[in-house]
Amino acid sequence: MSSSLYRVLRNAWEVGPRSYWKQLNSIGDTKSGRLVGTDIYGNKFYETDHQDEIHLRTRYVEYKEKDYDMSQVEPGWHFWLGYGVDTAPCNTPKEKLPIRAYPYKFQPNYTGTPGAFVTYNTLKPKISAWEPVTKQRS
Protein backbone atom coordinates (compact mmCIF):
# COMPACT_ATOMS: atom_id res chain seq x y z
CA MET A 1 0.00 0.00 0.00
CA SER A 2 1.39 3.37 -0.96
CA SER A 3 -0.23 5.43 1.78
CA SER A 4 1.08 5.93 5.25
CA LEU A 5 -0.98 7.40 8.04
CA TYR A 6 1.42 10.36 8.26
CA ARG A 7 1.08 11.05 4.52
CA VAL A 8 -2.73 10.90 4.57
CA LEU A 9 -3.01 13.19 7.60
CA ARG A 10 -0.46 15.65 6.18
CA ASN A 11 -2.28 15.85 2.86
CA ALA A 12 -5.66 16.21 4.59
CA TRP A 13 -4.28 19.08 6.65
CA GLU A 14 -2.75 20.81 3.60
CA VAL A 15 -5.76 20.55 1.26
CA GLY A 16 -8.56 21.06 3.78
CA PRO A 17 -11.61 18.92 4.58
CA ARG A 18 -13.66 19.79 1.46
CA SER A 19 -10.90 19.00 -1.03
CA TYR A 20 -9.89 15.96 1.05
CA TRP A 21 -13.40 14.49 0.76
CA LYS A 22 -13.59 15.32 -2.96
CA GLN A 23 -10.26 13.57 -3.63
CA LEU A 24 -11.28 10.48 -1.69
CA ASN A 25 -14.48 10.20 -3.75
CA SER A 26 -12.81 10.84 -7.11
CA ILE A 27 -9.27 9.41 -7.13
CA GLY A 28 -9.47 7.34 -3.94
CA ASP A 29 -6.35 8.92 -2.45
CA THR A 30 -5.30 12.22 -0.93
CA LYS A 31 -2.72 14.37 -2.63
CA SER A 32 -1.43 17.85 -1.94
CA GLY A 33 0.66 20.02 -4.18
CA ARG A 34 1.04 23.38 -5.83
CA LEU A 35 -1.37 24.50 -8.52
CA VAL A 36 0.52 24.52 -11.84
CA GLY A 37 -2.27 25.68 -14.12
CA THR A 38 -5.80 25.38 -15.43
CA ASP A 39 -6.94 24.37 -18.91
CA ILE A 40 -9.80 25.78 -20.97
CA TYR A 41 -12.23 23.22 -19.54
CA GLY A 42 -11.59 24.34 -15.95
CA ASN A 43 -9.53 21.31 -14.89
CA LYS A 44 -6.83 22.11 -12.32
CA PHE A 45 -3.37 20.57 -12.60
CA TYR A 46 -1.12 20.04 -9.59
CA GLU A 47 2.42 18.92 -8.90
CA THR A 48 3.85 17.82 -5.55
CA ASP A 49 7.44 17.78 -4.32
CA HIS A 50 6.93 15.46 -1.34
CA GLN A 51 9.55 12.72 -1.18
CA ASP A 52 7.14 10.03 0.04
CA GLU A 53 5.05 10.11 -3.16
CA ILE A 54 5.42 7.18 -5.54
CA HIS A 55 7.74 7.76 -8.48
CA LEU A 56 5.83 9.19 -11.49
CA ARG A 57 2.76 9.88 -9.34
CA THR A 58 3.63 13.46 -8.45
CA ARG A 59 1.42 15.14 -11.08
CA TYR A 60 -2.34 14.92 -10.97
CA VAL A 61 -5.49 16.64 -12.19
CA GLU A 62 -8.69 17.63 -10.42
CA TYR A 63 -11.47 17.56 -12.99
CA LYS A 64 -14.08 20.29 -13.03
CA GLU A 65 -16.97 17.94 -13.75
CA LYS A 66 -18.05 15.11 -11.50
CA ASP A 67 -18.44 12.61 -14.35
CA TYR A 68 -15.03 13.09 -15.90
CA ASP A 69 -13.25 11.42 -18.78
CA MET A 70 -9.55 11.57 -19.60
CA SER A 71 -10.40 12.91 -23.03
CA GLN A 72 -11.53 16.13 -21.30
CA VAL A 73 -7.86 17.03 -20.85
CA GLU A 74 -6.14 19.02 -23.58
CA PRO A 75 -3.33 17.20 -25.44
CA GLY A 76 -0.60 19.51 -24.07
CA TRP A 77 -1.67 18.94 -20.49
CA HIS A 78 -2.03 15.19 -21.15
CA PHE A 79 1.59 15.12 -22.34
CA TRP A 80 2.68 17.04 -19.22
CA LEU A 81 0.78 14.63 -16.93
CA GLY A 82 2.60 11.70 -18.54
CA TYR A 83 6.01 13.33 -17.91
CA GLY A 84 6.61 13.99 -21.61
CA VAL A 85 7.81 17.51 -20.79
CA ASP A 86 8.95 19.27 -17.65
CA THR A 87 7.40 22.64 -18.48
CA ALA A 88 3.64 22.95 -18.18
CA PRO A 89 1.75 24.24 -21.25
CA CYS A 90 0.80 27.44 -19.44
CA ASN A 91 4.50 28.22 -18.81
CA THR A 92 5.77 27.31 -22.29
CA PRO A 93 6.77 30.31 -24.44
CA LYS A 94 4.62 30.92 -27.53
CA GLU A 95 7.51 30.25 -29.94
CA LYS A 96 8.09 26.78 -28.43
CA LEU A 97 4.48 25.63 -28.62
CA PRO A 98 4.02 22.81 -31.16
CA ILE A 99 2.12 23.43 -34.36
CA ARG A 100 -0.40 20.70 -35.05
CA ALA A 101 -0.47 19.10 -38.48
CA TYR A 102 -4.27 19.17 -38.35
CA PRO A 103 -5.14 22.39 -36.52
CA TYR A 104 -8.68 21.41 -35.57
CA LYS A 105 -10.13 22.48 -32.27
CA PHE A 106 -9.81 19.74 -29.66
CA GLN A 107 -13.03 17.91 -28.74
CA PRO A 108 -13.58 15.55 -25.82
CA ASN A 109 -14.85 12.00 -26.29
CA TYR A 110 -18.64 11.95 -26.64
CA THR A 111 -19.07 8.17 -26.38
CA GLY A 112 -22.10 7.27 -24.29
CA THR A 113 -23.65 10.74 -24.60
CA PRO A 114 -26.32 12.14 -26.92
CA GLY A 115 -23.52 13.79 -28.94
CA ALA A 116 -21.92 10.44 -29.86
CA PHE A 117 -21.41 9.56 -33.52
CA VAL A 118 -23.95 7.11 -34.90
CA THR A 119 -23.65 5.78 -38.42
CA TYR A 120 -26.64 5.92 -40.71
CA ASN A 121 -27.55 2.45 -41.91
CA THR A 122 -29.54 1.87 -45.10
CA LEU A 123 -29.39 -1.93 -45.00
CA LYS A 124 -32.18 -4.19 -43.85
CA PRO A 125 -31.57 -5.40 -40.29
CA LYS A 126 -30.11 -8.91 -40.13
CA ILE A 127 -31.96 -9.78 -36.96
CA SER A 128 -35.35 -8.86 -35.62
CA ALA A 129 -36.74 -8.74 -32.14
CA TRP A 130 -38.68 -11.80 -31.00
CA GLU A 131 -42.38 -11.18 -30.73
CA PRO A 132 -44.06 -14.09 -28.96
CA VAL A 133 -47.38 -15.28 -30.33
CA THR A 134 -49.72 -16.93 -27.88
CA LYS A 135 -52.43 -19.37 -28.90
CA GLN A 136 -55.84 -19.22 -27.39
CA ARG A 137 -56.50 -21.94 -24.86
CA SER A 138 -59.54 -24.05 -25.40
Curated annotation (Swiss-Prot):
The keyword Transport applies. It is found in: Mitochondrion inner membrane. It is a peripheral membrane protein. The keyword Chloroplast does not apply. InterPro entries: NDUFA12. Keywords: Electron transport, Membrane, Mitochondrion, Mitochondrion inner membrane, Respiratory chain, Transport. One of its GO terms (cellular component) is respiratory chain complex I. Accessory subunit of the mitochondrial membrane respiratory chain NADH dehydrogenase (Complex I), that is believed not to be involved in catalysis. Complex I functions in the transfer of electrons from NADH to the respiratory chain. The immediate electron acceptor for the enzyme is believed to be ubiquinone. Belongs to the complex I NDUFA12 subunit family. Complex I is composed of 42 different subunits. This is NADH dehydrogenase [ubiquinone] 1 alpha subcomplex subunit N7BM. It comes from Yarrowia lipolytica (strain CLIB 122 / E 150). The gene is N7BM.
